[in-house]
């Protein structure tokens, strides 16, 4: 069966079918509300750091440190959510993160020392590190397995609206104060915590049969799984470089916060359009999932290099457009492939590891932008992209025919 076909017809029909499920629509809305603070994080942290210290570089450190915390916590948190009531645990974790983000807002307004700002950013990220994986676990209990790929495709498109709304919301509220973006993140995170409790019934999430217990003992790690984690890492690094650099790139072009937001909106709009086309037409695309992923990784790098030229608006816009066109299709490809490579009973742990790998990529992007000159930082992903693309040629790392 193709990635985008099911036993009852083509993907277009399955997209309509999954959208007709009330439980999926509730999950979709809740998932976006949970993700919205993540979309707000880069610009909100940069502006909070600028308001507190007068320099955006502390924001890069906060982003890198928070992403590193997610890497360390995502897998253990995923295991916890796998073995407990995912809804209740995710809700409490989100409430805790909302409190910490509120404290970070106050700390930024009072210009607390940078180490404390970084510490609060790390704590908030640690609390929410496993929640995206938990939401994926809840999705698996919300839609039939045959509708999972269409559900992911729709989700991948809708995510881009969140990517657009996040920076726009930050830009709107920072007119009040530079720390208002993080304050809005706190409020939205608290609202997401409340909505998570109204999702799939607990028995769909926590019931554990003897067969599930046995499945937990199955191996999780395999060479193809490691390869796809690497693909997720490199993709996140390239996307992160484009997103986090939007504000300094806008400044080099003579613009400001609004210019940065518009660049991010362009990226997100391109990603949403590409994701929609990919969800409906990927069955007609040539090559395997791995081959398509490699092509999109190369496309991401081309876009980032164009951004790095800082040669005026045309090349910068082209760079953000190319990055956007590759983003949603690549994310959908990675998630759907990881889903098939792991035992179902360890899905949340696997998605936690995927979150961790993308967190590493995002941390590398934030660290590069904090420590290196802007142009050097932007081309830093060339090395990791080259290594990842070369690794895909190794026979031992390739999935079997039924997994591509």
Predicted regions and their residues:
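Intracellular juxtamembrane helix-capping segments at the cytosolic ends
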Residues: 45, 129-143, 246, 329-342
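A late C-terminal transmembrane helix in Major Facilitator Superfamily
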Residues: 345-374
């Amino acid at each position: 069966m193709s990635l985008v076909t099911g036993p009852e017809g083509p993907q277009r029909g399955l997209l309509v079918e999954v959208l007709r499920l009330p439980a999926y629509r509730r999950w979709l809305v809740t998932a976006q509300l949970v993700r919205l603070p993540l979309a707000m994080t880069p610009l909100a942290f940069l502006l909070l750091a600028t308001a507190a210290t007068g320099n955006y570089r502390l924001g890069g450190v906060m982003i890198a440190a928070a992403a590193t915390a997610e890497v360390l916590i995502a897998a253990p948190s995923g295991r916890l959510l796998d073995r407990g009531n995912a809804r209740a645990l995710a809700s409490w974790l989100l409430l805790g993160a909302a409190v910490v983000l509120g404290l970070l807002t106050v700390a930024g307004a009072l210009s607390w020392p940078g180490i404390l700002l970084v510490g609060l950013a790390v704590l908030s990220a640690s609390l929410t590190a496993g929640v995206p994986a938990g939401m994926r676990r809840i999705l698996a209990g919300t839609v039939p397995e045959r509708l999972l790929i269409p559900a992911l495709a729709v989700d991948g498109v809708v995510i881009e609206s969140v990517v657009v709304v996040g920076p726009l919301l930050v830009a709107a509220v920072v007119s009040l104060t530079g720390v208002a973006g993080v304050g809005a993140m706190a409020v939205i995170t608290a609202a997401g915590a409340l909505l998570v409790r109204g999702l799939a019934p607990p028995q769909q999430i926590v019931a554990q049969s003897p067969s599930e217990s046995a499945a937990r003992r199955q191996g999780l790690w395999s060479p193809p799984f490691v390869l796809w984690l690497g693909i997720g890492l490199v993709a996140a690094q390239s996307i992160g470089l484009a997103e986090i650099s939007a504000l300094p790139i806008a400044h080099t072009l003579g613009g400001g916060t609004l210019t940065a937001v518009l660049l991010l909106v362009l990226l997100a709009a391109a990603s949403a359009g590409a994701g929609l086309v990919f969800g409906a037409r990927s069955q007609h695309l040539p090559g395997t999932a791995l081959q398509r992923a490699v092509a999109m990784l190369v496309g991401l790098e081309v876009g980032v290099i164009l951004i790095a030229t800082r040669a005026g608006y045309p090349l910068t816009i082209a760079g953000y457009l190319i990055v956007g066109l590759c983003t949603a299709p690549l994310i959908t490809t990675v998630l759907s492939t990881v889903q098939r490579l792991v035992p179902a009973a360890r899905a949340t742990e696997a998605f936690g590891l995927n979150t961790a790998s993308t967190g590493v990529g995002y941390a590398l992007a934030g660290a590069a932008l904090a420590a290196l000159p802007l142009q050097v930082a932007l081309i830093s992903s060339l090395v990791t992209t080259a290594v990842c693309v070369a690794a895909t040629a190794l026979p031992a790392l390739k999935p079997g025919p039924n997994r591509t």
